[in-house]
Regions:
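Hydrophobic, well-structured mid-protein blocks that either form specific transmembrane helices
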Residues: 121-165
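Bacterial N-terminal signal peptides that target proteins for export
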Residues: 1-9
Length: 270
């Protein structure tokens, strides 16, 4: 995956794969508690590349149905802005339809245009047979792949992680993981817990949990521990900031706006 794609996907994906010492597997768990999100939730993220505002990304959650099954429909949109748009135009659309109780995806759509590089894919998930049916709309090709239990797509993973956050109190350096299927490949998504931190944001001081999402080895990143993610330590579990060190500079992603949260957004006053 190129740097161009990451400028838009980082706040949605927040990392991929590797290992650590302690590990909590989330792949076979079904949430029994109240979900930390609901239909109507909306986020806007601002992505900075150095001193420039490189792009914006939005996430919106609505109610829908797939084959008569009630689902939540997450719509993601990313675009370059300002000076960055003159050099490199990005228009990315992502949709996922996932079970509103089990938080597993049934249908995923990726329709992107990044400086002339285009891709238009649909993935239908059959979790009973552990299969993903991938349709390339540009090439009119269909392929089927074996997937792991409860495999997530790029978008549903964002909500799955929030819903499946470990019940027990995490210790520093402990990790948890889920299974993912993206484009034509299976991955393992892992995050290491680094502790809590009071983060200064545009909204005020916010108590956050600090994580290290593990990403695939690529030439863009200096090393595999180059990404840091902050998630609000409250009932919403919102990714509020992400930093990624690159070979040439760094990317910073900040939560810019939000609405329709499940729980109060907590600000620290001392």
């Amino acid at each position: 995956m190129s740097l161009k794609i990451k400028l838009v996907l980082i706040p949605l994906l927040c990392g991929l794969s590797l290992l650590s010492n302690a590990q909590t597997a989330l792949a076979d768990v079904t949430p029994q508690r109240s979900l930390p999100f609901m239909a109507g939730e909306w986020f806007q993220f601002r992505i900075h590349y150095g001193i420039f505002n490189a792009s914006y990304a939005t996430l919106e959650l609505t109610k829908d149905s797939v084959n008569g099954i009630p689902v939540l429909h997450a719509k993601g949109y990313g675009t370059t802005t300002g000076l960055a748009r003159w050099f490199f135009k990005v228009e990315d659309h992502y949709d996922t339809y996932f079970d509103e109780k089990k938080v597993i995806p049934y249908w995923f759509i990726r329709d992107i245009d990044e400086g002339g590089y285009t891709k238009n894919l649909e993935i239908n998930f059959d979790h009973h047979k552990n299969l993903a049916h991938v349709k390339n709309l540009e090439k009119n090709e269909k392929k089927t792949y074996k997937i792991a239990d409860n495999a997530q797509d790029l978008m549903s993973a964002f909500y799955y992680l929030r819903a499946y956050y470990p019940d027990h109190k995490l210790k520093p350096n402990e990790t948890f993981s889920i299974n993912m299927f993206f484009d034509y490949e299976n991955y393992v998504f892992k995050m290491k817990y680094l502790g809590t931190e009071i983060l200064s944001t545009k909204f005020g001081n916010v108590r956050c949990m600090k994580f290290r999402p593990y990403v695939q080895s690529e030439r863009v990143f200096r090393e595999q521990e180059s990404v840091t993610l902050w998630i609000t330590d409250d009932g919403n579990k919102i990714p509020i900031r992400l930093k990624a060190d690159l070979v040439f500079g760094s990317i910073k992603v900040d939560l810019e706006k939000f609405k329709n949260l499940v729980a109060p957004f907590k600000i620290q006053f001392n």
